[in-house]
């Protein structure tokens, strides 16, 4: 019987090995066939792109000023330049990756950080110079900003974006590389760059000279054309530019001002993300009252979207809830390095009960109490955690997490006794 079983297992292993070998052979053959097809299609696509580029360039040389057709040709040529730059960068990356796999440890060092999108920028800047009333000028300015930002030139990108969404206050100068260099090196004698290029002053504080209070530079903005496209995305990118600026004293205020433009429309597809960024900007600036209000607004908006559509409004809801807990548990809201309780201020538990900071009647309200208690527990402030959890259990006895937090309270008591 054992010999029969062993023979059967040997036969099965042989069949499995043969089938697997044939499967791998066929898969390798198909992979090679598809790879050849893909390479051929890519070659044909690249050749077609180069022919199209040559045709558009020839057309533009022949008809450089036709207001009806030349800007369209330039716009399409810029897209083709963008595609070519992206393909060239990918080819460089693939070659460097292969070289490193073959033992060249320094192969990636010479790789540029981003595609060279300057040809696209140049042709689109030419549109701005020659055809400022082009019907797709919104897309031109957005893509100029996008390309410059990809090439790590964020100040120039911001200028293009502001000209798109705030055209009544900011004009775009296609020669911005020159005037930014002048701003860094000093203006030539008799040349007033600040007057000629007002966007040079965007990096400085925007304040009322009498009160020294921040004045929103984006309060009354109008787009470069009615019904302009890319407005929401552009305001978000402007907000990100300011949010990442750690030099300007009013960078956080400017980022909030940009995000708030998006928040004017609750139906905007970037609404939830902008709301989160506003909350985070307030948190980063230690403006904790505004931070908790906006994190709470995000949680409520996400839940409203869930109720209306069956889908969560924001994937950032859990993180917003986490930061609500962190902020309420933080003990120095006035940021003077002295605990608030030592100055007669409120405790985290007291702030949780403050209706002005945290609505007490929302479905998610007990979750904030639970999250705050968790922060106190992680900080080994067990009594604070127990007090908050006991309050939450008493006020929301039917909450789904009641059994869990009964156990957490018991655990906290044990840890406190150790």
Predicted region positions:
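Acidic, polar-rich low-complexity tracts and alpha-helical solenoid repeat scaffolds
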Residues: 1-418
């Amino acid at each position: 019987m054992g010999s029969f079983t062993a023979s059967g297992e040997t036969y099965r292993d042989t069949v499995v090995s043969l089938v697997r070998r044939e499967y791998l052979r066929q898969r390798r053959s198909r992979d090679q066939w598809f790879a050849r097809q893909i390479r051929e299609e890519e070659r044909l696509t690249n050749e077609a792109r180069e022919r199209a580029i040559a045709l558009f360039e020839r057309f533009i040389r022949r008809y450089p000023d036709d207001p009806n057709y030349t800007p369209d040709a330039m716009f399409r040529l810029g897209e083709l330049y963008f595609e070519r730059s992206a393909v060239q960068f990918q080819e460089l990356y693939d070659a460097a990756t292969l070289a490193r796999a073959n033992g060249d440890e320094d192969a990636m060092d010479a790789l540029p950080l981003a595609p060279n999108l300057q040809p696209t920028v140049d042709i689109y800047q030419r549109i701005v110079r020659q055809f400022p009333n082009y019907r797709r000028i919104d897309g031109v300015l957005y893509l100029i900003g996008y390309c410059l930002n990809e090439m790590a030139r964020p100040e120039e990108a911001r200028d293009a974006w502001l000209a798109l969404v705030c055209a009544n206050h900011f004009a775009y100068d296609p020669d911005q590389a020159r005037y930014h260099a002048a701003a860094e090196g000093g203006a030539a004698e008799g040349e007033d760059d600040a007057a000629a290029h007002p966007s040079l002053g965007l990096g400085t504080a925007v304040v009322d000279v009498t009160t020294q209070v921040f004045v929103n530079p984006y309060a009354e903005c109008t787009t470069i054309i009615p019904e302009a496209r890319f407005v929401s995305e552009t305001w978000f990118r402007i907000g990100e530019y300011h949010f990442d600026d750690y030099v300007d004293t009013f960078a956080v205020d400017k980022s909030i001002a940009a995000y708030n433009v998006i928040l004017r429309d609750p139906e905007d597809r970037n609404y939830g993300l902008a709301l989160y960024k506003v909350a985070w900007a307030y948190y980063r600036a230690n403006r904790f009252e505004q931070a908790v209000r906006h994190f709470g607004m995000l949680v409520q908006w996400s839940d409203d979207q869930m109720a209306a559509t069956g889908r969560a409004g924001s994937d950032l809801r859990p993180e917003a809830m986490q930061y609500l807990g962190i902020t309420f548990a933080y003990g120095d809201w006035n940021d003077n390095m002295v605990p608030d309780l030592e100055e007669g201020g409120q405790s985290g538990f007291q702030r949780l009960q403050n209706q002005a900071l945290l609505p007490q009647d929302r479905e998610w309200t007990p979750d904030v109490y639970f999250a705050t208690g968790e922060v106190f527990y992680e900080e080994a402030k067990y009594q604070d955690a127990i007090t908050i959890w006991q309050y939450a259990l008493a006020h929301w006895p039917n909450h789904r997490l009641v059994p869990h937090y009964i156990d957490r309270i018991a655990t906290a008591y044990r840890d406190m006794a150790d």
